[in-house]
UniProtKB/Swiss-Prot annotation:
Reactions catalysed, as given in the entry: 8 isopentenyl diphosphate + (2E,6E)-farnesyl diphosphate = di-trans,octa-cis-undecaprenyl diphosphate + 8 diphosphate
Gene Ontology cellular component terms for the protein in this record: cytosol
Keyword Cell wall biogenesis/degradation: yes
Protein name: Ditrans,polycis-undecaprenyl-diphosphate synthase ((2E,6E)-farnesyl-diphosphate specific)
Function field: Catalyzes the sequential condensation of isopentenyl diphosphate (IPP) with (2E,6E)-farnesyl diphosphate (E,E-FPP) to yield (2Z,6Z,10Z,14Z,18Z,22Z,26Z,30Z,34E,38E)-undecaprenyl diphosphate (di-trans,octa-cis-UPP). UPP is the precursor of glycosyl carrier lipid in the biosynthesis of bacterial cell wall polysaccharide components such as peptidoglycan and lipopolysaccharide.
Binding site for substrate: 26-30, 38, 42, 70-72, 74, 76, 193, 199-201
Annotated cofactor note: Binds 2 magnesium ions per subunit.
Name of the encoding gene: uppS
PROSITE patterns: UPP_SYNTHASE (PS01066)
Residues engaged in binding Mg(2+): 25, 198, 212
Length: 252
């Protein structure tokens, strides 16, 4: 899956991007263009996941978060959902050993309780196998929604208040942030969305507060290393203000 000898691109600037999140959109449209069913597009998209993980691991990125299955995706046709679940199992079985060999830590974020027991067991084993790896952290968002993430964090704080461990006046952004998925990782710097749509679709609502957004018309199965590099070039050329103003600009 990963190439240990793949060089860092000579054209890639010192991008300073530690955490990239990707909304992998366009599998269905890609399949339609090929005259195939949507499941064919999802399988083709898995190849793009391999490319993205390899590129991130070899180009100075600490964490890569991929939006694989949203909590709203259960509303898709049952046949497509079933195919996605089987693809998830297949990907874990076929890729996790390669991830482990290349020092990648795999984590699944989202509510996995709705998945069948076979998939839940695969997830637990995959996370356990790679838990102590120190290279790229690969987060797969599955049955994930940004609103769900915030709600589950609030519930955890409510339980602490109910238990008398925490007072309501002690709750602040930092305290809530500690209950949100990936709180121990660097904040998301860049969100990439493929497929031409310009929205975030309930993805990492808390974590992307100050992230840069990059939209491309490229469908996910066609997204390659050059496209990833282009996104990092765009990121490197942006000025991040984090709510402030441009240096030396005193105008409102």
């Amino acid at each position: 899956m990963l190439s240990a000898t793949q060089p860092v691109s000579e054209n890639l600037p010192a991008h300073g991007c530690r955490h990239v999140a990707i909304i992998m959109d366009g599998n269905g449209r890609w399949a339609k263009k090929q005259g195939k069913i949507r499941a064919f597009g999802h399988k083709a998209g898995a190849k793009s996941v391999r490319r993205a993980v390899s590129f991130a691991a070899n180009n100075g990125i600490d964490a890569l978060t991929l939006y694989a299955f949203s909590s709203e995706n259960w509303n898709r046709p049952a046949q497509e959902v079933s195919a996605l679940m089987e693809l998830f199992v297949w990907a874990l079985d076929s890729e996790v050993k390669s991830l482990h060999r290349h020092n990648v830590r795999l984590r699944i974020i989202g509510d996995i309780s709705r998945f069948n027991s076979r998939l839940q067991e695969r997830i637990r084993k995959s996370e356990a196998l790679t838990a102590h790896n120190t290279g790229l952290t690969l987060n797969i968002a599955a049955n994930y929604g940004g609103r769900w993430d915030i709600v589950q964090g609030v519930r955890q704080l409510a339980e602490l208040v109910q238990a008398g461990v925490l007072r309501p006046d002690q709750i602040d952004e930092e305290r809530l942030g500690q209950q949100i998925c990936m709180h121990e990782l660097a904040p998301v710097d860049l969100v990439i969305r493929t497929g031409g749509e310009h929205r975030i679709s309930n993805f990492l609502l808390w974590q992307i507060a100050y992230a840069e957004l990059y939209f491309t018309d490229v469908l996910w199965p066609d997204f390659d290393e050059q496209d990833f590099e282009g996104a990092l070039h765009a990121f490197a050329n942006r000025e991040r203000r984090f709510g402030g103003t441009e240096p030396g600009d005193d105008k409102a």
